[in-house]
Design a protein with these regions (language model features):
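Long, low-complexity ectodomains and other extracytoplasmic segments of secretory-pathway proteins
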Residues: 34-35, 170-177
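A surface/secretory-pathway sequence property marking extracellular, secreted
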Residues: 26-97
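Low-complexity, intrinsically disordered segments enriched in Ser/Thr together with acidic residues
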Residues: 3-9, 74-148, 174
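Short beta-strand elements of extracellular/lumenal beta-sandwich folds
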Residues: 1-27, 174-177
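Beta-strand-rich extracellular modules
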Residues: 11-13, 119, 155-159
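Enriched for extracellular/lumenal, surface-exposed ectodomains of secreted and cell-surface proteins
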Residues: 29, 135-139, 151-163
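Short Trp-Ser/Thr-centered turn/loop motifs at beta-strand boundaries
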Residues: 64, 161, 165-169
């Protein structure tokens, strides 16, 4: 498959310091939902991690291979007993969370950034391969190209702002002519 990176970025535009930042992301899968578990993200193929995530200084990454993350919200899963600090097969990871270590804060007027090493599949499953055929008739009339899309957004929260917030959505596309 094709290798690429997601860049997760949180900018604190205020002068307020935020502690206990937790960033939570489920990797795109066909039929996945947003971080609240309430709305389809409409991913049409699966994305996998290709290696360990290198967090910014002062943060620790935890991984899970649990499929439950696709049925439940960040609020339900972020503290569940499913997380480990390493895995033997990064392609099996379904979600990760990045947690601020004790004493680490997102300072005022600063940015948190981390690159997520991802990979599109070498071969699409049957359900994903059926989707371009469904789209073809729509695209033939408009003259546009057909593609499959994997959509990603991440959730985050802090001690000072404990309500889960969701990032903007980004996508990876596989075009078909």
């Amino acid at each position: 498959g094709t290798n690429f990176d997601y860049l997760l970025k949180i900018t604190n535009e205020t002068k307020t310091e935020y502690s206990d930042l937790v960033v939570y992301d489920t990797l795109p899968r066909s039929g996945d939902k947003n971080v609240f578990g309430t709305q389809d993200r409409s991913s049409e193929f699966d994305i996998h991690l290709r290696r360990v995530i290198t967090p910014p200084e002062g943060y620790t990454v935890f991984y899970t291979t649990s499929a439950e993350v696709y049925q439940k919200s960040m609020a339900d899963m972020v503290n569940a007993d499913i997380w480990m600090d390493s895995v033997s097969d990064y392609s099996a990871v379904t979600a990760f969370k990045i947690v601020a270590n004790e004493g680490t804060a997102l300072n005022g007027e600063s940015t948190f950034e981390v690159r997520i090493p991802a990979q599109a599949p070498n071969q699409l499953d049957d359900a994903s391969m059926a989707k371009p055929h469904e789209k073809t008739s729509q695209d033939q009339t408009s003259g546009t190209a057909t593609w499959l899309e994997a959509n990603n957004s991440f959730g985050f929260q802090t001690n000072e702002s404990p309500t889960v917030m969701e990032s903007n959505t980004v996508w990876a596309r596989i075009p078909f002519a």
